[in-house]
Design a protein with these regions (language model features):
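C-terminal motif of bacterial Sec signal peptides marking the signal peptidase cleavage site
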Residues: 15-19
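Hydrophobic alpha-helical membrane-embedded or membrane-associated segments
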Residues: 10-14
């Protein structure tokens, strides 16, 4: 009987050990599978992080386009370009309007030996604006546009200040071109007019005046100053742009002192608004 009990106990012990061994194998297998899965996931995440995202590709493409060298157009090519197309030009600063600090832009009158350009609200820094002295060559990229007859570069930016030679244009005497189709071909150029007669304007109250603050007389000192001149029986509207020549400048004060009937000579830039509307920088009353 004792032998039978001993044999039974031995059998139970063997079964118990086998069960323990089986449990260990299962746990080991589970741990191994979990570890392998985790390592695979980490590897996949690592590979994914090394792949460029669509935004990365887009940024890389954009940066590449910035570095592409733009084709600089001659004045003839610029004039032949379609409206609303992007253009790049190089020309010399002849004058500039005040810097718009909030927008980071400036309006610049440009000219080379072949013609002139008007860069409206060109993006640049204050430091770049200060460096653009008369005669300085700059490169500008923007869109060729038309506004009320004026051909200009809009939404532009200063690409660079070009080191080297300088150029200051001599005014073209455009007096005899007044009233002709040829005058428009010199749009935005530095021009002069001689022997003009101050013609009357009508202010907001219907009174005759030699000049007006704003085109309709609704302004005050410090605003643009408009005045009429006549030549060969035709009357033209000229303006002193306050952002170009403020109320403290000689030309602004000279226009404020004009009298109807006086003979004057003028210099300025041949801006266009529904016809010739020069931005005047100098007025001299004939002796």
């Amino acid at each position: 009987m004792k032998k039978l009990i001993a044999a039974f106990l031995a059998l139970c012990l063997a079964c118990s050990m086998a069960a323990c061994a089986g449990g260990t194998t299962s746990e080991s297998s589970t741990a191994s599978t979990s570890s392998t899965s985790s390592e695979s996931s980490v590897a996949e995440e690592s590979d994914a992080s090394e792949e460029p995202s669509s935004s990365d590709v887009s940024e890389a493409s954009y940066e590449g386009s910035d570095t592409a060298e733009a084709t600089v157009l001659s004045h003839e090519e610029y004039m032949a370009a379609e409206l609303d197309t992007e253009v790049t030009i190089q020309a010399y600063v002849q004058a500039k309007q005040s810097y718009y600090a909030e927008q980071g832009t400036a309006t610049v009158y440009l000219q080379d030996q072949d013609g002139a350009y008007f860069a409206y609200d060109m993006a640049c820094t204050q430091e770049e604006y200060d460096a653009m002295t008369e005669g300085t060559c700059i490169q500008v990229t923007g869109f060729k546009s038309e506004w009320s007859g004026e051909i200009e570069i809009m939404d532009g930016q200063l690409d660079q200040i070009v080191e080297g030679d300088t150029f200051v244009a001599e005014p073209l005497d455009a007096t005899e071109l007044l009233g002709t189709d040829e005058l428009e071909q010199h749009q935005n150029e530095k021009v002069s007019f001689t022997g003009l007669t101050v013609a009357p304007s009508t202010d907001a109250n219907g009174n005759e005046a030699a000049f007006l603050y704003n085109y309709d007389g609704s302004g005050t000192q410090g605003d643009d100053v408009y005045f009429n001149v006549s030549y060969n029986g035709q009357t033209y509207s000229f303006v002193v742009e306050s952002y170009l020549c403020g109320s403290d400048t000689e030309v602004y004060k000279a226009v404020e002192a004009l009298e109807v009937g006086q003979t004057i000579d003028c210099e300025g830039f041949l801006y266009w608004y529904e016809g010739a509307n020069p931005h005047i920088t100098s007025v001299t009353v004939a002796a």
